[in-house]
Amino acid sequence: MSISLFSLAIDQTSSMFFYLSQFLSFLALPLTITISLIVLGAFFIQRKWGKRSLWAGIILLWFFSNPFIANQAMLAWEPQFKAFNEVGNHQIGIVLTGVTNLSKTAYDRTFFNKGADRITHALQLYREGKIKKILITGGQGLNPVNPQSEAELLQRFLVMTGVPAEDVMIEDQSKNTYENALFTKDFLEKKGIDVNQEFILITSAFHMKRSKACFDKVGLQTETFPTDYYSNDTKYDVPTLFFPDPYSIFIWHKLVKEWIGILVYKMVGYL
């Protein structure tokens, strides 16, 4: 009974932090700010501050939709990728989920989102002998549609590619990055695996700072292996420098949501 109550408390806390983070992210999103300024300015266009609001919104919309500026911001945030031959040999590579479409259910395949690099690069590390086993951490998230956890889906994918089932472990209860770290440590301890060894941490580059900090917080040593890059090599051409692109706003949304996530994690003591 006490275990059930504890689990319920954990779930409620996770939900609260998730919705708090989502709400703060919505308020701080570039599109929210720019549209608010433009709409406010349009309604009060006859007033001096209304015109300023309108122009501020238009200028910010151009700023956030500029491909060059968005790419430079993401380049500055994402850590540099590592060559496979620069990675040391480890027993276990830890893969964070968040790369499949859990809103579409199928039992004979995995629907990947952009972040598929997380699992495909983990597979490459395994094939090249850099890791001996793969531990996938991640459950269904909040408000799941698919009854299968992401960890299960990715485990099945790896087995289909020829990885022996005994070399793929899953932790399928975590709902956020902090729980990824916390539940992974608990899983390893229950399996009798040395938690003092160094692991390879595999996740998207934009998400690596928060992920690494969470694993540090719970006492797991990791070598990072960033994947799934949103930034590109710098280009100086007319479309990149001057033409607005909706994808650039998406890049800023990823950055702002990650920054808000880090802020919330610090507020609640996860980092």
Regions found by a protein language model. Give the residues of each.
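Membrane-embedded alpha-helical segments of integral membrane proteins
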Residues: 6, 10-43
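Hydrophobic alpha-helical segments of integral membrane proteins
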Residues: 16-24, 69, 73-77, 252, ...
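Alpha-helical transmembrane segments
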Residues: 23, 30, 49-56
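Structural signal for the C-terminal ends of transmembrane alpha-helices
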Residues: 40-49, 65
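Hydrophobic membrane-insertion alpha-helices, especially the h-region
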Residues: 53-67
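A structural signal for short, hydrophobic/glycine-enriched beta-strand patches
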Residues: 63-245, 252
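Short, surface-exposed patches at the edges or C-terminal ends of soluble domains, predominantly
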Residues: 229, 242, 246-247, 260, ...
